[in-house]
A protein has these predicted regions:
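A generic "folded-domain core" signal
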Residues: 35-181
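Bacterial N-terminal signal peptides that target proteins for export
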Residues: 7-23
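Basic polycationic patches enriched in arginine
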Residues: 2-4
């Protein structure tokens, strides 16, 4: 894990851009909102969070992205983990998380802020809140806390836990709301 942590600290911007482009590629096939040639441009970094922006036709799509500061669990061939807050043309914000593997069917992905917990709905490699009100509540918690922990189960039944720093989140979220009108 130590090698991975030092890799992220030195190359975090490049890693996040690569992850976002993979995310956009995934959604190119899964959603009509995203068009061919998706490429998000880094707008600003706010400590542990990065703000990206792209245009899809007449829609502005912005993302806040971060990678874990700590990972646990021994899952073979685990890919990169990341957490996103997506905003499309200043519409409702949506959170999503990828833990670097295919999630177990009929499992929940737990997002915790100390004793406060939320449960996300996983589909293949991504997980989302079940409703917009949960997205809103999660974003409020992200603004009040120093970190959050994502606990999930892989398709092989192994448990993984990723800790994300929330340092810089509030500032990056305010900027997202400002530039994504």
């Amino acid at each position: 894990m130590r090698g991975r942590a030092s890799y992220f600290s030195s190359n975090k911007s490049q890693v996040l851009k690569s992850l976002l482009n993979k995310f956009l590629l995934f959604f190119f096939f899964a959603s009509p909102v995203f068009a061919e040639g998706s490429s998000a441009a880094l707008q600003e970094k706010f400590q542990d969070w990065s703000l990206f922006k792209t245009n899809r036709g007449d829609q502005i799509v912005c993302y806040l992205a971060s990678t874990p500061i700590k990972t646990t669990g021994s899952i073979l061939n685990r890919g990169e983990s990341f957490f996103l807050v997506t905003n499309i043309k200043n519409d409702a914000d949506e959170i999503s998380v990828a833990s670097g593997f295919i999630y177990k069917n009929n499992s929940d992905v737990e997002l915790s802020f100390g004793s406060k917990k939320f449960y996300l709905f996983p589909y293949r490699i991504l997980a989302w809140a079940n409703e917009k009100s949960a997205d809103i509540d999660i974003i409020k918690e992200m603004q009040k806390n120093a970190d959050m922990v994502v606990t999930s189960v892989s398709s092989s039944g192994k448990i993984a836990s990723d800790t994300y720093s929330l340092i810089g989140f509030t500032q990056s979220y305010k900027q997202l709301k400002k530039i994504c009108k």
